Structure formats: structure tokens, C-alpha cells
Design a protein with these regions (language model features):
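Helix-hairpin-helix/helix-loop-helix acidic hairpins
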Residues: 6-65
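C-terminal accessory module of base-excision DNA glycosylases/AP lyases that mediates lesion recognition
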Residues: 36-50, 54, 73-169
């Protein structure tokens, strides 16, 4: 039985949640990503892995629709976590949730700034700036998740946190 036949791990569930591709097509993407793990790991950085995936899965190249930036980010994070590829303390603002959270937290006031990566074209903020913004804010938040989370955990938390705030309004 192929290692791609059964997908029960949380990475698969996250990728499915963010993808607009059909389950069948997404399974092809997932299996191809798993097969190419060694190639991606050799690239050595989140940025290079992400760009490689975006090129591979752009609709025109792969013929599979619905594999956008968020799905590529999730696939890239799967590899980065599995092989301990550093994000260099960058919290990537993938999608509107983390971007809105960063605006609500006023992360860009003062010394912190939103940076755009020259390699990926995506925006990010530094983890320390996100932690400091939460600590300075008057909003309720999960102190443990923010203080002890890695870059991807904090990005996910920002998305969920912002979503909960919108529901309360």
C-alpha cells in the first residue's frame, strides 16, 4: 500500500481545509509533494521551497485547479516542520486572517514593519514583533500560544484569533 493511500494526519486535514482543489486532485498534489520531499529539503529554506511549489502547482503548469498560495504554504510548512527547516523567526501573513490580525494589533506602529520577501513576494513580520504587539494590546489572547508558539503556530493562532474577534463584533 502506498504511503499516500491513507491521509489521516493533521497536515493533510489542514491542506484540505485551505485548498479549493477537489479531493482527488489534492490527493495527487499531496502524493507528489511527499514523493519530492528530498528535492524540496535540498533547497534549504522556506522561501525557496515555497517558490518551487508555487511554480510547480500554478494552474497553468500542473493542470490542477485550486492549488493557490495558502495550499502551497501548508504543503511547505509540512516539509519545514518535518525536516526542521527554519523560518528564521518570520511569521508569514498568508491570507486575510493574519493580515487583519496584524492590523488590529497595530504591529506596524513603531519599530516593527511588515516586510515583503524578495524571493516569494509574500508579506511577513518578525515573531518578536507579533509577541510584543499581543502583549501591548488590550485584547484577550492565549498567552501560552503566543509566547511559546513557533512561527507557524502563531500565524495560525492569529488567523483564528482574528476570526473570533470578528464573530464577537
Amino acid at each position: 500500500m502506498s504511503h499516500c493511500q491513507r491521509n489521516t494526519d493533521s497536515d493533510w486535514n489542514t491542506i484540505r481545509a485551505h485548498s479549493r482543489a477537489s479531493k482527488k486532485n489534492l490527493k495527487k498534489v499531496w502524493c507528489e509533494t511527499k514523493r519530492n520531499e528530498p528535492k524540496y529539503v535540498k533547497l534549504g529554506s522556506f522561501e525557496k521551497i515555497y517558490v518551487s511549489m508555487r511554480k510547480q502547482w500554478k494552474e497553468a503548469n500542473s493542470g490542477i485547479r485550486g492549488v493557490g498560495p495558502l495550499t502551497c504554504y501548508d504543503l511547505c510548512m509540512y516539509i519545514c516542520k518535518k525536516y526542521s527547516v527554519s523560518l528564521n523567526d518570520r511569521v508569514w501573513l498568508m491570507g486575510y486572517g493574519p493580515q487583519r490580525a496584524a492590523n488590529k494589533l497595530k504591529i506596524w506602529k513603531g519599530s516593527a514593519e511588515c516586510k515583503k520577501c524578495n524571493i516569494t513576494g509574500e508579506s511577513y513580520v518578525m515573531l518578536k514583533d507579533v509577541v510584543a504587539a499581543f502583549q501591548k494590546s488590550t485584547f484577550e489572547y492565549d498567552k501560552e500560544k503566543v509566547k511559546n508558539g513557533n512561527e507557524d503556530d502563531v500565524e495560525s493562532y492569529m488567523c483564528c484569533w482574528e476570526n473570533e474577534l470578528r464573530k464577537k463584533d
